[in-house]
Amino acid sequence: MINILFVAGGTGGHVIPALNMADYISERAPHWKISFIGRKNSFEEKLIAGKYDFYGLDIIKSSDIKKLSYYLSIKDALKILGELEPDILVVFGSYITVPIIVASIIKKLPFFLHEQNVIPGRVTKLFYRFSQGVAVSFPETREYFKDKDKIYLTGNFVRTELLTMDKASCKKELGFDENRKLLLITGGSQGSMKINYEVKKIIPYLLNNGWQILHQIGEKNYVSYIEGIPIEEWAKEGYNPVPFIKNMELAICGADFAISRAGATTIAQFLIAGLPAIYIPYPYAKDNHQIYNAEVVVKVGGGELLLENQLNSEKLITLLDKWDNKDRLAKASEACRKISIANGRENFWNLILEKLEGRN
């Protein structure tokens, strides 16, 4: 029996691919033991606990790296690894994972890193030489590493089952009219107050122009967002604001166009589904990595880049009117699919098997 440990936390961009990969392995090797490490009382614990064994570390911040609390987290990580004795770890890099990586190096445990973004994060760049290899989502990412022999283009770990479903069927399952166009709006797993604020101003305009709208608000922002809007009236015309979209694959499958952040996992899903979008990168992302993610799509004609400091309701209307064209959407959809990597989980699964066989 192989004991595999996933390390992920922070945002859906790290946690969702980890969970997707774990599910893929579970289906193909049900005898393998699969566990997760993340932060206590966190987003990832809520998402994972009950499905897989979850081990929580005390929450630490990137600013704590030079503080005692970080070294205590390494001590806790060493204890957990000693108890679990994993054969291999899969790490989805962020500052949260550093104590586990350090503990793995100390205990000489093999680990893979997965880099979702075009621009590799600091954790990936710092520790990749100690790893079995880095699985990357974009071919452009290889250029940021000196030791390219450790870099493997697998693609992101995206569920593909629903992304190949019929668009009309997906709309129907989501509760929308299958004969009308559907706009998906998401500010990421946490939502975006800025995107929500500007979108709210143009909902009547969009509805009058035939759009149905599925809008992920974010759980923290939902109550304040819906206050004062004619929610029942707008709902009758096809507007559905929700705190969190539980089945994002279904939403992506049913959508004709999107307004979205430019997280790597979101982009991977959009590309596979052939979903063009207006990308509004999160402005506080390290090294502006969401801008680089979006540019990969924009340069092939698969969407539009709109910086948050340029975002306003008038600009959104201009861009949405530009993209409200069947021929333009069809060409963009095809461009997205051409650069997509649909078999990321299979590629990484084969890589794990190869490394494990080479160990024996």
From Swiss-Prot:
Enzyme Commission number(s) from the entry: 2.4.1.227
Catalyzed reaction equations: di-trans,octa-cis-undecaprenyl diphospho-N-acetyl-alpha-D-muramoyl-L-alanyl-D-glutamyl-meso-2,6-diaminopimeloyl-D-alanyl-D-alanine + UDP-N-acetyl-alpha-D-glucosamine = di-trans,octa-cis-undecaprenyl diphospho-[N-acetyl-alpha-D-glucosaminyl-(1->4)]-N-acetyl-alpha-D-muramoyl-L-alanyl-D-glutamyl-meso-2,6-diaminopimeloyl-D-alanyl-D-alanine + UDP + H(+)
Subcellular location: Cell inner membrane
Gene Ontology annotations for the cellular component aspect, listed alphabetically: plasma membrane
Record's bilayer topology term: Peripheral membrane protein
Keyword Glycosyltransferase: yes
Pathway noted in the entry: Cell wall biogenesis; peptidoglycan biosynthesis
Function: Cell wall formation. Catalyzes the transfer of a GlcNAc subunit on undecaprenyl-pyrophosphoryl-MurNAc-pentapeptide (lipid intermediate I) to form undecaprenyl-pyrophosphoryl-MurNAc-(pentapeptide)GlcNAc (lipid intermediate II).
Family statement drawn from the similarity comment of this UniProt entry: Belongs to the glycosyltransferase 28 family. MurG subfamily.
Protein name as catalogued: UDP-N-acetylglucosamine--N-acetylmuramyl-(pentapeptide) pyrophosphoryl-undecaprenol N-acetylglucosamine transferase
Organism: Dictyoglomus turgidum (strain DSM 6724 / Z-1310)
